[in-house]
Amino acid sequence: MIQMQSILEVADNSGAKKVMCIKVLGGSHHMVAKLGDVIVVSIKEAIPGGKVKKGDVYKGVIVRTKTGVVRADGSTIKFDKNALVLLNKQDEPIGTRVFGPVTRELRAKKYVRIMSLAEEVL
């Protein structure tokens, strides 16, 4: 579960390395974000020559969390780190590649494009 001030890694090739959550979208009672939720982030660490730079504010969809997700069959999928994919104003991925695995739960949230860019879908 991701809340304000949480530090996440970026799972795409947009040029950002680490971001900080500054707002969880989804209404006033939406205090934490889970897998597939959209949050507003600030870039804290970026590589030179990337598409984004430090201090920029973007939206991002969460693709991996430490708390994981429980599926209907009872299985649980957890990851070592929290990660997200940066989105532009039209809610499309900024990067052209997604590193690491993503879960099938993104399909229900209408992020099929991220699933097609990912290396592995669990």
From Swiss-Prot:
GO cellular component: cytosolic large ribosomal subunit
Sorted UniProt keywords: Ribonucleoprotein, Ribosomal protein, RNA-binding, rRNA-binding
Function: Binds to 23S rRNA. Forms part of two intersubunit bridges in the 70S ribosome.
Pfam families (alphabetical): Ribosomal_L14
GO molecular function, one term: structural constituent of ribosome
Recorded name of the encoding gene: rplN
Alphabetical list of NCBIfam families matching this protein: rplN_bact (TIGR01067)
Span of the signal peptide: none
Coiled-coil residue spans: none
InterPro entries: Ribosomal_uL14 (IPR000218), Ribosomal_uL14_bac-type (IPR005745), Ribosomal_uL14_CS (IPR019972), Ribosomal_uL14_sf (IPR036853)
Source organism superkingdom: Bacteria
Family annotation (SMART domains): Ribosomal_L14
Similarity field: Belongs to the universal ribosomal protein uL14 family.
Protein name: Large ribosomal subunit protein uL14
Biological-process GO terms, alphabetical: translation
UniProt keyword RNA-binding present: yes
Subunit structure: Part of the 50S ribosomal subunit. Forms a cluster with proteins L3 and L19. In the 70S ribosome, L14 and L19 interact and together make contacts with the 16S rRNA in bridges B5 and B8.
